[in-house]
Amino acid sequence: MKKTSLVLSLCLLLSGCGAQTQLSNDGKVASCINIETDQSKNIGTKLKCLDGKSSVLLESIKGPTLINIWGSWCAPCRQELPLLRSAYRSGKVKIIGIDVDEPNTQSGKDFAIKAGITWPNLEDPSGKTKSAFGMGVPVTWFLNSDGVVTYKHIGIFSSSAQLETEIKKYL
């Protein structure tokens, strides 16, 4: 009986740790070091990583990946976050966020940490990407394996089924 209780307790403890780890960002903004880029591209829009340690040329990002444009002040962006977190945790899709129009970098960092955003994020404090992405947020771009935009989803994803369908169709 004691052995069964011990095994059951251990299983519950381990399953709880796994779930928490998947949502945790350890109180830090995710690094951009693993964003894959095409080094032959050197002209375009350079954005700093939200962690402040590097920058990425937007036009050099390789796919397949989702580029999700968001702002901490954007209620619809917050609404779709659980769907994006679930898709990212599944390991079936890479996501890169672009935080736009924040009053300051710290606002974006604080939001990313509090919201459990564990994928890399770039920042666009001046809104210079609006000409490429459009005026509103959220907007999600789908880049195929060649880094070519295959689809632009404007607005929030209404369900995980919708997001999964678009991932399968456009990546």
Feature-to-residue mapping (PLM):
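Hydrophobic beta-strand anchors of alpha/beta hydrolase catalytic cores
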Residues: L66-I67, I95, T140
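A short beta-strand-turn-helix
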Residues: G44-T65
